[in-house]
């Protein structure tokens, strides 16, 4: 347990108010962490949770699995009894256009609206500050009562990554895809690719994107005009062009907003 405790950044729990801000011995840290996470032993955190779909940014290591599981546990505790509404995928699908419209709304306004629309469909949205070494952008999990958790961490939460991560996770939920398999890299990759493709095509319709790219004009004014036409946040267009290598990542940074999304 000591080795596991040393993989965990205890400062996070002080900063987020889970424990009083004082000095702790290793032994005390272990006791506190067991309490916070509701586990008999921290060793329970080392196993990959197959009932969860993770969007991670690097390969899984024991350290990242431990820290990802902690984030998941913290999010689950927050979300567990929020609603008895069962996940309704049809309703979620019908709500997609309303969710997409939020990309152009003020960051002060959209989080509540986003939370409400999802809750109405049986999805509890939780935003958590990223725990160091968790390498986690988001995750989804189904609760015993039929509702679902959608966790987003504030890791790299620039506006384009935020919306992409959100719709990636919604893609998993719509596919009823709530499991990851670290043993079977091929399956995991396919399920991630499906969710990525869903997010891409939903945020910018393939035919619209194709037509825009074929014109070959990628000035700031072109990006703003196209974003206006298809009614999406300009950073989503910019992020797509950057990810596909059409523009470099240092261009037009001013089109991206930083969101601090913690619920």
Regions found by a protein language model. Give the residues of each.
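Active-site hotspot residues in diverse enzymes, especially metal/ion-binding acidic/histidine motifs
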Residues: 1-263
């Amino acid at each position: 347990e000591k080795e596991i405790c040393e993989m965990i950044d205890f400062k996070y729990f002080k900063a987020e108010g889970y424990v009083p801000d004082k000095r702790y011995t290793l032994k005390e840290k272990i006791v506190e962490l067991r309490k916070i996470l509701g586990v008999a032993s921290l060793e329970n955190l080392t196993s990959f949770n197959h009932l969860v779909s993770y969007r991670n940014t690097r390969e899984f290591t024991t350290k990242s699995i431990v820290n990802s599981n902690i984030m998941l546990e913290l999010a689950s505790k927050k979300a567990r009894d929020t609603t008895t509404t069962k996940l309704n995928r049809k309703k979620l699908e019908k709500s997609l256009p309303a969710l997409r419209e939020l990309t152009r709304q003020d960051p002060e306004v959209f989080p509540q609206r986003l939370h409400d629309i999802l809750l109405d469909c049986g999805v509890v949205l939780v935003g958590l500050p990223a725990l160091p070494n968790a390498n986690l952008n988001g995750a989804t999990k189904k609760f015993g009562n039929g509702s679902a958790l959608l966790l987003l961490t504030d890791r790299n939460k620039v506006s384009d990554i935020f919306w992409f991560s959100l719709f990636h996770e919604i893609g998993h939920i719509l596919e009823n895809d709530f499991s990851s398999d670290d043993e079977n890299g091929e399956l995991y990759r396919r399920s991630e690719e499906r969710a990525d493709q869903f997010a891409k095509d939903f945020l910018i319709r393939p035919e619209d994107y194709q037509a825009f790219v074929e014109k070959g004009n990628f000035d700031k004014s072109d990006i703003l005009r196209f974003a206006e036409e298809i009614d999406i946040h300009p950073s989503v267009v910019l992020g797509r062009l950057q990810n596909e290598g059409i523009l470099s990542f240092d261009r037009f940074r001013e089109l991206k907003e930083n969101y601090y999304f913690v619920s």
